[in-house]
């Protein structure tokens, strides 16, 4: 993950950014962010959804440590949403639960932007 390890950014900042973005994707279905942050967040999101496919106490605890409160859901509601609505959509799918769509560059600083979204797998 050398592409996300920038000068002046601490490990705590990087971990918190991933936690915020994972929570937002699970809450809203998609987010718009920079390409590098989207790719970094996608890795953790895939692992969290894979863990959530089996609903037990230990898996809920493992997932909860990566989630944060969002504007619409708190951590407990977000965990229930993940285990009851999001993960069952992907039971027959082995990975590839999300995708990164490139949007082009941001006007202000020419940073590549992207959308990170969950794939709508209903079967």
From Swiss-Prot:
It comes from the Bacteria. Keywords: Ribonucleoprotein, Ribosomal protein. InterPro entries: Ribosomal_bL17 (IPR000456), Ribosomal_bL17_CS (IPR047859), Ribosomal_bL17_sf (IPR036373). GO terms for cellular component: cytosolic large ribosomal subunit. One of its GO terms (molecular function) is structural constituent of ribosome. Pfam families: Ribosomal_L17. GO terms for biological process: translation. Disulfide bonds: none annotated. Part of the 50S ribosomal subunit. Contacts protein L32. Belongs to the bacterial ribosomal protein bL17 family. This is Large ribosomal subunit protein bL17. It comes from Mycoplasma genitalium (strain ATCC 33530 / DSM 19775 / NCTC 10195 / G37) (Mycoplasmoides genitalium). The lineage of its organism: Bacteria, Bacillati, Mycoplasmatota, Mycoplasmoidales, Mycoplasmoidaceae. The gene is rplQ.
């Amino acid at each position: 993950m050398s592409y996300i390890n920038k000068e002046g950014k601490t490990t705590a900042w990087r971990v918190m950014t991933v936690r915020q973005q994972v929570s937002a994707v699970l809450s809203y279905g998609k987010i718009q962010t920079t390409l590098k942050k989207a790719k970094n967040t996608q890795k953790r999101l895939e692992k969290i959804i894979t863990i959530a496919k089996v609903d037990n106490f230990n898996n809920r605890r493992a997932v909860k440590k990566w989630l944060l409160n969002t504007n619409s859901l708190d951590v407990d509601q977000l965990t229930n949403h993940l285990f009851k609505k999001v993960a069952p959509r992907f039971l027959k799918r082995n990975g590839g639960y999300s995708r990164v769509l490139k949007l082009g560059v941001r006007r202000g600083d020419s940073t590549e932007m992207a959308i990170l979204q969950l794939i709508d797998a209903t079967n």
